């Protein structure tokens, strides 16, 4: 899946569904089994903050997508600063985009 489509899904889910912002919130959503899609930023430093997300997603059978920057992800998530990760909890109108993945 492309990073652009993942960011589009985050924006749609933010306005019509529900998302969790931040690496800790995304981790909790995955562990609780409520995450539909996890999107994380490649430029997070230190990388250990998000390094576990792809492995945890694979273990829990959750789709996971990397995007280039935390600033782009923050904008898509509706926050004024960058965010390391976002988990989509309720996809809302982004349901069709998630099906593509």
Regions found by a protein language model. Name each.
Residues 1-34, 71, 92-101:
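Polybasic, low-complexity intrinsically disordered tails and interdomain linkers
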Residues 11-14, 31, 54, 58, ...:
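Signal for well-folded cores of large energy- and translation-related assemblies
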Residues 28, 51, 75:
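Alpha-helical elements of the RecA-like P-loop NTPase motor core of helicases
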Residues 43-49, 54-55:
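Compact, glycine-rich, soluble single-domain proteins
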Residues 55-101:
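Short basic, glycine-rich beta-strand/loop surfaces that mediate nucleic-acid
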């Amino acid at each position: 899946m492309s990073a652009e489509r993942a960011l589009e899904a985050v924006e749609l889910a933010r306005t019509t569904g529900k998302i969790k912002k931040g690496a800790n919130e995304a981790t909790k959503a995955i562990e609780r089994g409520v995450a539909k899609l996890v999107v994380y930023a490649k430029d997070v430093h230190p990388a250990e903050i998000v390094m576990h997300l792809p492995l945890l997603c694979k273990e829990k059978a959750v789709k996971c997508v990397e995007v280039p920057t935390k600033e782009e992800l923050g904008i898509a998530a509706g926050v004024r600063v960058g965010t390391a990760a976002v988990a989509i909890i309720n996809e809302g109108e982004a349901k069709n985009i998630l099906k593509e993945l």
